[in-house]
A protein has these predicted regions:
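Conserved RNA-binding domains used in RNP assembly and mRNA/RNA metabolism
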Residues: 1-150
Length: 150
């Protein structure tokens, strides 16, 4: 489901591997119509389980600290709307054309969301979630001398 900046929605199929590769996205609507949309006019692309549910995002914030590994972010759109989610902890994927966001409601209709960079005014990292990669602290050497040589 594609949400445009003007507020309209388009139910369509598209190739997710082509996202961010160009300034346009090619879609096939559920009516069988082939369209080319400009990325600058798209607010977000929601990859959904079914088209029957017309709500794009059930919940826009996490109720508690998320458990998925990645960067917990809050995205602020140009229209002052916002959504929280988890993005990959890989800056190469984030920097260029947009964000691939896992939404807060994992059991909802939306599986993941692509947000073009042109639709965003701010992305704030709220936390880093994942496995700690720290090495265990080395045992402190004994500063007290031994009484007997053994």
């Amino acid at each position: 489901m594609i949400l445009r900046i003007d507020g309209t929605r388009v139910q369509a199929y598209l190739n997710p591997s082509a996202l961010g590769a160009s300034e346009t996205v090619e879609i096939l609507t559920t009516d069988g119509e082939y369209l080319t949309l400009e990325m600058s006019k798209i607010k977000s692309i929601h990859f959904v389980r079914e088209f029957t549910n017309h709500q794009p995002a059930e919940r826009k914030t996490f109720l508690s600290r998320p458990k998925l590994e990645g960067l917990w972010v809050r995205c602020l759109f140009r229209d002052k709307d916002s959504i929280e989610g988890i993005v990959a902890n890989n800056l190469v994927e984030i920097a260029n054309h947009g964000l691939r966001l896992t939404p807060p409601d994992l059991h909802g209709n939306t599986l993941w969301i692509f947000i073009p960079r042109t639709a965003l005014s701010e992305v704030k990292v709220l936390g880093v979630v994942g496995i700690s990669r720290r090495q265990p602290a080395a045992a402190a050497s004994s500063s007290q001398p031994k009484l007997f040589d053994e």
